[in-house]
From Swiss-Prot:
This is Photosystem II protein D1. The chain crosses the membrane at residues 29-46, 118-133, 142-156, 197-218, 274-288. GO terms for molecular function: chlorophyll binding; electron transporter, transferring electrons within the cyclic electron transport pathway of photosynthesis activity; iron ion binding; oxidoreductase activity, acting on diphenols and related substances as donors, oxygen as acceptor. The gene is psbA. It comes from Phaeodactylum tricornutum (strain CCAP 1055/1). Residues 345-360 form a propeptide.
Amino acid sequence: MTATLERRQSVSLWERFCGWITSTENRLYIGWFGCLMFPTLLTATSCYIIAFIAAPPVDIDGIREPVAGSLLYGNNIITGAVIPSSNAIGIHFYPIWEAASVDEWLYNGGPYQLIVLHFLLGVASYMGREWELSYRLGMRPWIFVAFSAPVAAASAVFLVYPIGQGSFSDGMPLGISGTFNFMLVFQAEHNILMHPFHMAGVAGVFGGSLFSAMHGSLVTSSLIRETTENESTNYGYKFGQEEETYNIVAAHGYFGRLIFQYASFNNSRALHFFLALWPVVGIWLTAMGVSTMAFNLNGFNFNQSVVDSQGRVINTWADIINRADLGMEVMHERNAHNFPLDLASGEVLPVALTAPAVNG
């Protein structure tokens, strides 16, 4: 008998670390994107909680009139927010070490940039982590493609829009009422309701909700009963079972007769792809719309587009919306300027027709 001795292969610490990071056997998959995702999201979350509770007022408009957003300064859950960085900072990168002191950094709204930039890095890494885990499990990549829609939307309102407007003070505040304020001001300045891409986004979100409700109710109504009348139908399903849990033929026949034949899918895979595609494309288009309006390519303007034979304006809903927009714009940053830009930017009126003679 011959005995063969082989030298044991030594595995370096780095190789063991790589194996642990990319292992799909972990209860929570980490992945290389996770190495960036976990610290950035933890940083953003920690700073957000602290700032929402205790951040001092921020000079958002850059006119030495601080706005309080935290709970300890008199706000509640509805009115509280992390106030965007000061207009005095503009679009400049403003980390802690760029300020003369922590007090100055807080006064100028530094936490907003810290939270937003770490959050965007974190959600982008989460999207990459979805692709990475799908790749390691041999799955198709559609999960990360679908998640790219909310990532694009967040990037549009937190990064692209401030860049286009020239200041992080124009970004969306991190709070409930601040979000509503952002929406009203956005409508006032860009007429987003009349932008085709926003219309597509509304169709995507509401259409996706409708299709989801229709699909869920159809499936629930056509479940194959595996239990008695005294038990919940949910007990008739076993996780991982191979047979269908609902009768797609019955659901197809019902919906085809309710609407018309070709309104109903007869292919389960095509149906679920459509359910994913519709809202994702809608949110993609909305993010594109916000990103173009960031550079003032605004919604359609049909103001005073209907006149009578005498040239007098016949008001339409477009004119009523325009009047509402002007009212909202007047209320926005009311101490930073006297008039909205639409009212202040008229034709230049000459004050002096000739230059005065100066006798020296």
